[in-house]
Amino acid sequence: AAPLAHAASVKQEIPAQWDMEADVVVLGAGGAGLMAACQAHDRGAKVVVFNKGGSSYHTGTNLCGGLFTACGSRMQKADPKIKDDWKAFADDIIAYGEHMSLKEPVYGFTKHSGEAFDWLEDHGLAAHHLEPYAGHTNVRAHRQDSFKGRDYIDVLEKEIKARKIEVHHRMPVVKMYFDEAANRVVGVQCGRDGKFINCRAKMGIVMATG
């Protein structure tokens, strides 16, 4: 996170010519990044993903023990004993983080978490179940029967390949290019060991770096 914060804080001269461009640039190829890439693609965007690690299987999602907390999924709604809502879910997350979280991204996640889990189910997610989990006032932990986070990555990798979305591994972000006139980040430089790519992001950048 520190190198990325440094990259974002230093004014960078925008390249006169880009090496490549996409509508949406996703940084990070774990569960959040690959899901974002699929969703942007399905809404008509050209997407490219840059990942610091060597594989999507070298990410936090793969190491999560097959756990996905979600509110409003089909599985949760099917249990009549569970009465849950996105605001209660958000309150649990914010309390667990000692009220230091920004509410907007937490609300965005909790409102759409059930929909996201249903999407994984619809695209072939392996067997799973519901269970209680520490810090949550309701039963919303969806756990893979395998206890392996790679079940999620398996689904997402399959869908990324089906959509022919470019994923560049071992390509950490080292610069962000900010256009003062447009008042937004318009591109990134990714790479290492003297080999770098300047990629324009015509619509935006998704930060999913953990």
Language-model features, listed with the residues they occupy:
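Short beta-strand "acidic-cap" motif of Rossmann-like dinucleotide-binding folds
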Residues: 46-51, 207
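N-terminal twin-arginine translocation
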Residues: 2-14
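Beta1/beta-strand and adjacent pyrophosphate-binding region of the FAD-binding site
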Residues: 16-32, 48
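Core beta-strand elements of the Rossmann-like FAD/NAD(P) dinucleotide-binding domain
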Residues: 19-22, 193-204
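Aromatic pocket-lining residues of Rossmann-like dinucleotide-binding sites
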Residues: 40
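Generic hydrophobic/aromatic pocket-lining and core-packing "Φ" positions
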Residues: 34-37, 117
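Short, well-ordered coil/turn residues at beta-beta hairpins
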Residues: 28, 191, 207-209
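Conserved N-terminal/central alpha/beta ligand/cofactor-binding core
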Residues: 13, 52-166, 170-175, 183
